[in-house]
Amino acid sequence: MIQTKDIIELTDTYGANNYHPLPIVISKAEGVWVEDPEGNRYMDLLSAYSAVNQGHRHPKIINALIDQANRVTLTSRAFHSDQLGPWYEKVAKLTNKEMVLPMNTGAEAVETAIKTARRWAYDVKKVEANRAEIIVCEDNFHGRTMGAVSMSSNEEYKRGFGPMLPGIVVIPYGDLEALKAAITPNTAAFILEPIQGEAGINIPPAGFLKEALEVCKKENVLFVADEIQTGLGRTGKVFACDWDGVTPDMYILGKALGGGVFPISCVAANRDILGVFEPGSHGSTFGGNPLACAVSIAALEVLEEEKLTERSLQLGEKLVGQLKEIDNPMITEVRGKGLFIGIELNEPARPYCEQLKAAGLLCKETHENVIRIAPPLVISEEDLEWAFQKIKAVLS
């Protein structure tokens, strides 16, 4: 059997150097556990950036995949499929929105949200042609496509890719007065993550989302929540916006929408917003394909049936409390909602992620000095306690 070092060598030889992974190869996975080619087992505390909320290879989701793969996998949108309509209904009811537009990856859904907001601004708000603006937040992460990196404040994400998309206005995260000052008659939308993930699990001030939504409604600006990473139970609520009792004008969903098995994403909004599209104005050959829809329906059913949102809230509160008790001045803050947790250090986090790997835990540094803890929501209390003891041993 091919070994870890051989696979990494092949990757380094032939793969574009656009990632810096920990030196581990995963060849098997189930639930919260993964295994390398040599048979070493590790607990997954990253969940593929929250795409695996339901756990690796959840039986119900895998069975849905196999059943659908044995019938039909792709029709394109030139024809109807028997899975798309039921999936539309499932997501519309989950988000309490009237319409859903399917894509494949989170970044594609972000691009779709940008296009939706711009067209809405021109067709409904009557902004002058080619003058629409979109407000975003510093340290955001909305993906790697041109629209998404144009919204980023990280210059390394932009280097060598210019010119950027015009009409982007960047404000500090969680700053209500900056939002008010940034809005002009040309503002189409305010796009934000309810909790910033890649920036280090940044949580806005309590009440900010609600106040920002009120400002947007007053100024006729769309409030768009990127819940790709925070949605579907990760933060202990179905959506992170729920922490402020906020229903955005538009949701952007992805990652766990496919149960860690098949990529599917979408935007969801009411008809007065998504109704700006007509046939031919936007699309995707694979978007809303029957295989993805069947998997997604099962993934959403697992979240509901196994009460994973409630588990995330309960287990997350306990783990955050435990982590805050670790006595080490190197730890400057522990923050999080549900099982979406950041441990901020006053030094680089990667060496500690490597030590955690040696102890049997897989997690990844984010924003240089933050260890992100985000296990699959199916994790047992016993396994989470085991993980905490390992983390405590490394960080104490």
UniProtKB/Swiss-Prot annotation:
Primary location: cytoplasm
Entries under Pfam families matching the protein: Aminotran_3
Cofactor: pyridoxal 5'-phosphate
GO BP of this protein: L-proline biosynthetic process
Keyword field: Amino-acid biosynthesis, Aminotransferase, Cytoplasm, Proline biosynthesis, Pyridoxal phosphate, Transferase
Metabolic or biological pathway, per its Swiss-Prot or TrEMBL entry: Amino-acid biosynthesis; L-proline biosynthesis; L-glutamate 5-semialdehyde from L-ornithine: step 1/1
Keyword DNA-binding: no
Enzyme category, top tier: transferase
Family the UniProt entry places it in: Belongs to the class-III pyridoxal-phosphate-dependent aminotransferase family. OAT subfamily.
Gene: rocD
Classification via InterPro entries: Aminotrans_3, Aminotrans_3_PPA_site, Class-III_PLP-dep_AT, Orn_aminotrans, Ornith_aminotrans_bact, PyrdxlP-dep_Trfase, PyrdxlP-dep_Trfase_major, PyrdxlP-dep_Trfase_small
Function: Catalyzes the interconversion of ornithine to glutamate semialdehyde.
Catalytic activity, EC: 2.6.1.13
PANTHER family linked: AMINOTRANSFERASE CLASS III, ORNITHINE AMINOTRANSFERASE, MITOCHONDRIAL
GO molecular function: identical protein binding; ornithine aminotransferase activity; pyridoxal phosphate binding
Catalytic activity annotation: a 2-oxocarboxylate + L-ornithine = L-glutamate 5-semialdehyde + an L-alpha-amino acid
Protein name: Ornithine aminotransferase
SUPFAM superfamilies linked to this entry: PLP-dependent transferases (SSF53383)
Source domain of life: Bacteria
Subcellular location per the Swiss-Prot or TrEMBL entry: Cytoplasm
Naturally occurring in which organism (per UniProt): Bacillus cereus (strain Q1)
Modification sites for N6-(pyridoxal phosphate)lysine: 255
GO cellular component term, pick one: cytoplasm
